UniProtKB/Swiss-Prot annotation:
Keywords, ordered alphabetically: Disulfide bond, Seed storage protein, Signal, Storage protein
Similarity annotation: Belongs to the prolamin family.
Pfam families cross-referenced by the UniProt entry: Gliadin (PF13016)
InterPro entries (alphabetical): Bifun_inhib/LTP/seed_sf, Bifunc_inhib/LTP/seed_store, Glia_glutenin
Transmembrane segments: none
PTM statement from Swiss-Prot or TrEMBL: Contains 7 disulfide bonds.
GO molecular function, one term: nutrient reservoir activity
Function text: Seed storage protein. Not integrated in the gluten polymer through disulfide bonds, unless incorporated by reduction and reoxidation during dough making. Increases dough strength and bread volume, but decreases dough stability when added into a base wheat flour.
Protein name according to UniProt: Avenin-like a6
Residues making up the signal peptide according to the UniProt record: 1-19
Length: 181
């Protein structure tokens, strides 16, 4: 009798879930497609946007002047950028650094041409462009020190266009010649 009750309860719960799904999707196929789908693994882009804004808006001068730095929201941006960066593997940080540098590069290109880069027919899903040395150098010099994280040495010598995109919780492996990376 107890097992029958549990079985009936499970059947009712399953039927309710299916009915709710049907009700939600019965208004049209397009609305079903617009419902957010759960992502099995986190995507890096939101944190990297925060990191690019952090690097561009929170200069070393503002960082040294702590009251101005805190009032400008830099402390919150630093936390939103640095916490996820500290939680990923060093290998994945190399891709994160490339993502930040590319976001900054696209923003600067958009400013140069008077409009955001994405409005010019390019999207973030296209193949990576070569990041200028000045931008990559600024990111590599500033981000690790402001976030107190280590960036692998090969990030300083490997072009971003050759680094495979990483999902942060899957470690990337580097090929090292002679045991040195």
């Amino acid at each position: 009798m107890k097992n029958l009750f549990i079985l009936a309860l499970l059947a009712f719960t399953a039927t309710s879930a299916v009915a709710q799904l049907y009700t939600t999707c019965s208004q049209g196929y397009g609305q079903c497609q617009q419902q957010p789908q759960p992502q099995p693994q986190p995507q890096p882009q939101p944190q990297m946007n925060t990191c690019s804004a952090f690097l561009q808006q929170c200069s070393q001068t503002a960082y040294v002047q702590s009251q101005m730095w805190q009032a400008s929201g830099c402390q919150l941006m630093r936390q939103q950028c640095c916490q996820p960066l500290a939680q990923i593997s060093e290998q994945a940080r190399c891709q994160a650094v490339c993502s930040v540098a590319q976001i900054i590069m696209r923003q600067q290109q958009g400013q140069r041409f008077g409009q955001p880069q994405q409005q010019q027919g390019q999207s973030f899903s296209q193949p990576q462009q070569q990041v200028p040395v000045e931008i990559m150098g600024m990111v590599l010099q500033t981000l690790p020190s402001m976030c107190s994280v280590n960036i692998p040495q090969y990030c300083t010598t490997t072009p971003c266009s050759t680094i495979a995109p990483a999902i942060y919780n899957i470690p990337m492996t580097a090929t090292c010649a002679g045991g040195a990376c």
